[in-house]
Design a protein with these regions (language model features):
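Alpha-helical transmembrane-bundle signature of multi-pass membrane transport and export proteins
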Residues: 1-262
């Protein structure tokens, strides 16, 4: 995760510099060529483990069992809803090109730098979590971090200064990292070993569906009411729906693992 976040900081900033210096087509070409190293690494990999036992479960039956378990385990279901709603309504990242050009008035390089904000916040939050060790009262911290994510997104939509926008975007990344760590750990702790893969599959529906559908929602709202309104309303709805989840799922709100989680 740390390597991925560092790459997310360096990549957009470097892309912004390259686009400003050379033709954007060459930037895409360089990106395509870079995948050659990944393909080569995959070709060089050799698996030396034992052959896995054949899976005798039926696909649809296994999926239904995973959905049934996830829904009946109310704490896990609450984390799924938080994940989906936050990513569905807070799709500020897709608006960055317009925000960079029309709101904070920076060029291509400024856009690339602004794109690194969430990753910088994620790295800082990850370092703090690692330094502090155990997180207590995980349910409260989870709900608070998602609410902070929504508030940061809301004010990001109102900001017109580049540095303030960057700070708020970084704050949203930090809050998202804290909530992601807690959500993921809670799910693993509460899921039996034989259902963990199916629960993860259900989680991927929420994890992948929220951002993709959210981009469509944000685009429709932005086209009708403008980009700032789309971002602000998304952040506000995230905060309100987090409050609803806190009220609707008291067990999630009160959740605390016996020894804390990291």
């Amino acid at each position: 995760t740390l390597v991925w976040q560092i790459a997310s900081v360096i990549g957009p900033a470097l892309a912004g510099l390259m686009v400003a210096a050379i033709n954007i087509g060459w930037v895409y070409a360089a990106n395509a060529i870079s995948f050659g190293a990944v393909i080569l690494a995959l070709l060089l990999m050799r698996y030396r483990g034992r052959t896995a036992a054949p899976n005798t479960g039926l696909g649809w039956q296994a999926m239904a069992e995973g959905l049934r378990f996830t829904y009946n385990q109310r704490i896990i279901w609450g984390t799924m809803l938080l994940d989906f709603m936050a990513t569905f309504f807070s799709s500020a990242r897709m608006m960055l090109p317009i925000i960079a050009s029309d709101v904070v008035h920076v060029g291509v390089w400024g856009y690339g730098l602004l794109s690194t904000g969430q990753s910088v916040g994620s790295i800082v939050a990850g370092a703090i979590i690692s330094y502090r060790g155990e997180i207590k009262r995980q349910g409260h911290v989870l709900l608070l971090s998602v609410a902070i994510y929504g508030v940061a997104t809301l004010f990001f939509g109102l900001a017109t200064n580049f540095y303030l926008s960057y700070a708020l975007f970084a704050l949203s990344g930090a809050a998202d990292t804290v909530s992601t760590v807690i959500r993921g750990t809670i799910r693993q702790l509460l899921t039996p070993d034989h259902l963990r893969g199916r629960m993860t599959g259900v989680n991927m529906i929420f994890f992948m569906g929220g951002p993709q559908l959210g981009e469509m929602e944000a685009g429709l709202v932005a086209s009708a009411f403008g980009v700032p309104f789309a971002v602000v309303s998304g952040g506000l709805l995230t905060v309100l729906l987090t409050g609803w989840v806190a009220w609707r799922y008291p067990k999630l709100r009160a959740y605390e693992a016996e020894h804390g989680i990291i």
